[in-house]
């Protein structure tokens, strides 16, 4: 039979074990968890359209600043609205991927009911962002439109799109010029038949 003394000792032991378990669970976060938090903050700042806050996060990823800064200005100028934000995912020991689906003026100008998903792949070194790469599931017609504008209406984009996604200073003006060009493409005889509009891009 357990005596009062035994019961007291058992209660103390159980309490100590529980306390230790809770302490372990509340311990320092894993490096992967830290990277996920940083990546989520990166997405927050990217779509808050605050370039100073975004660039502050990219101090250790200087080579990525020209493209990401332009992307941010392009997204703001094109009225990008987040339709679906998936949680960022660790895709490697030092890599996190974040996929964001947006609606913007470019696809609206083409008259296509399709929202593009942009994926940002962040590489880390010593807990800091080392680089950011981007990819997209934009349809083939999107790239056809861009090529058409380049060839048929270079006057629209010649000045505002200098340094496009490579440090250009007027991303907002650039995307607005592209929207105008895309709208012209949509009413041109070069615009694809409806059956071809949702064709995936072939960028090989």
Q: Where in this protein do the model-derived segments appear?
A:
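Bacterial N-terminal signal peptides
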Residues: 9-18
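Short, low-complexity N-terminal intrinsically disordered segments enriched in polar/charged residues
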Residues: 20-44, 48, 196-204
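Short, well-ordered alpha-helical segments enriched in acidic and aromatic residues
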Residues: 46-64
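Low-complexity, intrinsically disordered terminal/linker segments enriched in charged
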Residues: 132-204
